[in-house]
Amino acid sequence: MGPQLATVSLLLLTFFSNSIQYPHSPAATECPAYFNGNIAGNACSREYSICVNGVRQAATCSDDSVFYEDECVPVDESPECRVDENTEEDDTPYAEFDCTSKQDGIYSIGCSNQFISCVAGGAYMAKCPDSLVFNERTQDCRESCDEVKQDTTTAPQVYEDGEEGYGEASGEIAGDYERQPSNEQPDSIDFDCNGLEDGNYADGCNDVFYSCSNNMVFQRYCPPGTVFNINQQSCDFQCTTDDPTTTVSYSTSTITTPQEDDSEYSSTTSADVISTTTTPSIDAIETTTTGFDAVTTTTTTQTPFVCQEGQVNSFGMCSSRFNRCQNNSVRSKQCPVNTLFESSLVMCVFDLPQCQPITVPAAPAYNSYGPPSDTIVSPFDENVRLKPKFDRRRKYHHGKPSYGPVNGNSYLENPFFIPRHRGGSHRDHRRYGYGPAIDSPFSTAFRGRAALSDQFKDYRRARMGKIQGDARKVDGNKRFLIDDEFEGPNAKFVESNIEQVFPKNRHSKKQLGPHEDPDGYDDEKTFDAKDLFGATRRKRSAYYGTEQSVYGQQSAQISARQAQVNKDCQQYTTPTFLTFGDCFDQFIFCSGNGINRMAACPIGETFDKTLRSCSETCGVSTTIVAVTIGTQTSDDLSAPSEYIENDGVTTQSTWNDQPSTTQAPNSYESYTTQYSSNDVPSTSAAPIGDRCSLDASGLFSLGCSQKYIQCSNGAAIVRRCGESLYFNEATQECTYRDEVPECGSQGSTSSPVITTPGQDQSSNYYGIPSDDVPSTTQTPVGDRCAYVASGLFDLGCSQKYIQCSDSAASVRECEGSLYFDERSQSCRFRDEVFKCQTADVSSSSTVPYLDFTTTPASPSEDEPTTYEPSVAPYIPSVTVNPVDTCTSLSDGTHGTGCSSFYFVCSHGRLISSGNCQLGEGYDPSVQGCRTFSEIPARACDEQEVTTDAGLVQLMPYKTLEEVLTTTEAATTVANDGPTDTYITGSTKYSTTDSGEYTIPYGDETTSTRSYDRADNDSEDEEEDDVEHDQKCTVGSRTPVGFCVRTYLECTDAGNVEKLCRIGKLFDSHSNRCVPRIGCGKEAIRDAIKDMIATTPAPAQPKQFEGRCAHVDGEAVFSIGVCSSKYLRCSYGASKLQQCSEDRVFSNDKLECIVRESVSACTVPKNPSIKKYYTSNDQSAFCDGKEDGLYRNERDCSAILQCFGGELFEHPSCQSSLAFNQLTGKCDYPQKVSGCENHGQTNGECSEHGSFIADANNCEVFYRCVWGRKVVMTCPSGTVFNPLLSVCDWPSAVPSCSGQASDSNSSYGSSTYNDDKSGY
């Protein structure tokens, strides 16, 4: 018991931080070459040395043990620590030495050969060998007390093995080992650990790596067939990524490397030039400063070299952390949530293809021998458990090589195999727990095992436990050990605690079938050792998907976000960054060769457009200097140089071994423009850093902006107000824009610098070139709305336009052949749009009201083409009172086509807008968000829909394009008035707007525009044309769209465009202007009737059918207590709506209010725990019970825990479940013995799955589950409807009209008042 206890203690003290270890002195005896075992230190001492493959590591015994012979034994059992009883205490040097207040260790009593060893508060005398004295400074025995040798960093002295071997893997030793010195020197190791931290380092992608410990180097080897992966710090079958990787340098000064010179320092001064040179290396750093008065000051300092500037080290393929060298120091960086670090691009990206989950098929394919198939041979096998087979692996030999003939499996030299037994006495005892203390990828805490990396997931790692199992049986979580126990005929098993080594989510849940071979091998075939590590390894049953390319799996499903990114990057053929605004944390990287990523900056950094990289000081005015672009060093990947063209600066990105450097302009102003008043202040103001240098602490505004500066002890931090709020420096708070003095007089200025494409072509934000826009570069949609107020803005001469609402942009399109006119804020004919007239007349490549005109530079032959944008002010044409988007729309939710954007209108005003979740779009037929595959095709064809549910087909109305298919109008102004002429077919036309006039016509206010054309030479032809083109009846009206204000009325002069008055829309069904709340109702009913007559009835009833049938007009109702959803009724139509975040609907106020103000939303943090036992019964219940969870005999759902003889109560299971103490989980009552009747009620269940109403409580009902009743409860405010077997409103169940318990769910009063509706 004593040796085993000492062994376990030694293991804990060696591998954990609370162990006491002393660095071995150079005078201590080193380990012989390739020797494995223990070497004792001083007499009666806890310190000793462990030799692993000739490498020495210091170790200590536990507090109450000392090292004697070959093991740690108690102090009392060590002969070296015994005290002579005949010795008088007064004469002993340690009699007066007090160890009670000292830590365990060795203490000197003077320059003598005796010293004191304090163990557990007791003093024990120990002696050095003859002619040696104890040296207090070195803590060992030496020839003199003043002898102190200097440490060296050379490899330790190695002794040659003796004549006698150390035995085989069984641990048996032929004889005692005697160390014999040898004059032969080992091979020198060509690796220097000076200045490196303790750890493992690789010298290329091979099987050799080096371990540094205390500036000492140790050469190590990986198993055959594997190489050392520096990123994973373990031996693997291949190297994933070349390391190190360099990325964009964060240096703020020009870095140069001086030539090595005989002189240690060099200084240069100049009276005319002010220069500063920084050299991050061990050599001298020279700084020269020259004043204006020709006074020269030279300061020379020396800074140690820590790392190469910009060097990046990753932590593996699918890791979110990485290290980056910045300012000659290594800094740890963390990627944001849902992003991983991609080493090849040196950035944090979303949707990394290499780390996407793989779908495992239901029936995995099995492979044994034969040609390659679609099943990948992978070392990370998750379903295989190897069957034990005697002598199927080759043995390892640690002694001298055998020169005789070898039959069967030959011996292999394994430098990382640790023998189970060591030399010396007590060889018949098994002792675990000794392992190498040096950090090694193959180190293990269990002696006598083959040390494998955690990445080999074939269940070979064992823990100590009771030996049990059968030689040929694989059952449960047992697995065999790879060690010398296979020397005998029976393989042994140990219980595994695999969940501590490999979490459950890293393993497949699939169970092996009854006829499947657990290891996937054919036992009748010969087994080769290379099958485990070599290329001839047979394929197993686990499926890993199709082969992976360099950048990811081809078969993995591309997410909707990645698909949108690929679409945005289609037009770019050179590396380009797409930003979402200035100092935003996310951006898009387009490589130009198909590798596109949605990326994000590390935590604490934002993307700086001026630097085209992530920065911690985005927005700080500073001088831009040389930027180093990351390189990719690869043996099999080489491509010509490519160029990143952004903001007028060309950056050369080379994919070869040599990095390139691009010199940016010398001033920050060349990258910046005058920002608009909404977001970012003008750069003419003081920089952020200078602002805080004047005022050490406080909050300062940046003009009329949502961002502001927080100065703290001279350091500047850029912060941002909440949504739609601006910072007011006078009140030191974020408030509305109209309350900020700085926003009162500022006007619109130019837009910021944007990312321009590589080719001189115009393109919109979505990456699709526009056919109707001149060749120029435009501002992206997102940036356009970030710097202007809400409203509608054109995209040049185009049918598409932008709708800005609270800095959110949505792209819309005019109907038919109409183009958007920003001046009138409406869709008109092409010849009536000012931008289109300018585009037709202008022959240059510039168009007014656009942001930039692209002018190609004239580079030399050796330089790439650079596009320098000329800054032009952006002046949006915004009317004083812009027309709201919802002016001509009915109340409710609206969307365009199958986009994910939707907005809510109420009384002709825009209430709110939003976007569906990723991968979903707005479906007008259900008035909600659905996946794109579930949206019907008809809904995608509609440009504008109503708020009523059930609209799944187009309305029967004529469009303007159908009315004017063969007639196009033009107007010429004569002396006395307009002259009506007509031109047929596709004759080119021009228009001149005639004067508008209003005619009172009942409820309509008419805005008339005549459609005329020029005169022809022949009056006969004109009359024929009039008779041919006149197809309308005088007095008839034609709708232009569905429920819009504009319509056409036929007159003698032709079709005249008219407008309904504000608040009314033209109804195509009644052919007149009606209130907007009732527009299209009859047409919708007719369409639904036609649809019902031609299509079968839906299988399921509408969710809110009949709930608004009793409501006349409009009303809102709550659907539950503390619910963020509520029901809006509008003329019998119901619609479920959602409050904004952190708000719930109040039935008293009939509006959404803050959740904290509702008392019903206050929920206790900890659920109440049933108290079944008093303090007197606690000891009685846990008497004789082991620690664990138990079921309460009084309540099957209660959970009790016994720990240390004390009773603890836990929250109970649900009322319908019972606690199963065998599984430790809540289970069905019929599976728990003694709880079969728990949760059941009286009554009979004739049919499984049927529902039974409760006779006494309308809110309670029962569900039949295999002959038993399960109690269920309806939500608050609803009762059970036995006719429909659903929870329904109380009004729908006559027998339960007044039994709803929730008073807040009453209908309340209607908010509709017809008298005050304004129609």
Swiss-Prot record:
Query: Which cellular components does GO assign to this protein?
Result: cell periphery; extracellular region
In which residue ranges is the amino acid composition biased (Basic and acidic residues)? 513-524
Which intervals carry biased composition (Acidic residues)? Answer: 1017-1027
Recorded phenotype for the gene knockout or disruption:
RNAi-mediated knockdown causes the zygote to exit the spermatheca with a pinched morphology and to leave a trailing section behind. Zygotes have a fragmented chitin eggshell with an accumulation of chitin at one end of the embryo, causing polyspermy. In unfertilized oocytes, disrupts the homogenous distribution of cortical chitin synthase chs-1, pseudophosphatase egg-3 and kinase mbk-2 and causes the loss of egg-1 and egg-2 cell membrane localization resulting in their premature accumulation in cytoplasmic puncta.
Report the leader peptide range. Answer: 1-19
* UniProt xrefs under Gene3D superfamilies: Chitin binding domain, Glycosidases
One Gene Ontology MF term: chitin binding
Provide the residues annotated with a glycan attachment (glycosylation). N327, N1016, N1304
Biased-composition ranges for Polar residues?
Answer: 745-764, 984-995
Q: Which UniProt keywords apply?
A: Chitin-binding, Developmental protein, Disulfide bond, Extracellular matrix, Glycoprotein, Repeat, Secreted, Signal
What is the disulfide pattern of this chain?
A: C61-C72, C128-C141, C222-C235, C335-C348, C601-C614, C721-C734, C814-C827, C916-C929, C1060-C1073, C1139-C1152, C1213-C1226, C1274-C1287
Q: Where is the Chitin-binding type-2 domain?
A: 28-83, 96-141, 190-236, 304-357, 566-614, 689-745, 782-838, 883-942, 1029-1081, 1105-1163, 1179-1237, 1242-1298
Record localization: Secreted, Extracellular space, Extracellular matrix
Composition bias of kind Low complexity appears in 1297-1312
Q: Which GO terms describe its biological process?
A: eggshell formation; positive regulation of protein localization to cell cortex; positive regulation of protein localization to plasma membrane
Q: Where is this region: Disordered?
A: 250-271, 504-524, 649-682, 742-764, 984-1031, 1297-1319
Q: Which residues cross the membrane?
A: none
- Keyword Endoplasmic reticulum belongs to the record: no
Pfam name, any one: CBM_14
Its biological purpose = In unfertilized oocytes, maintains egg-1 and egg-2 at the plasma membrane together with chitin synthase chs-1 and kinase mbk-2. Essential for the formation of a continuous and cohesive chitin layer following fertilization.
Protein name, per record: Chitin-binding domain protein cbd-1
Question: What organism does this protein naturally occur in?
Answer: Caenorhabditis elegans
Gene name, Swiss-Prot/TrEMBL: cbd-1
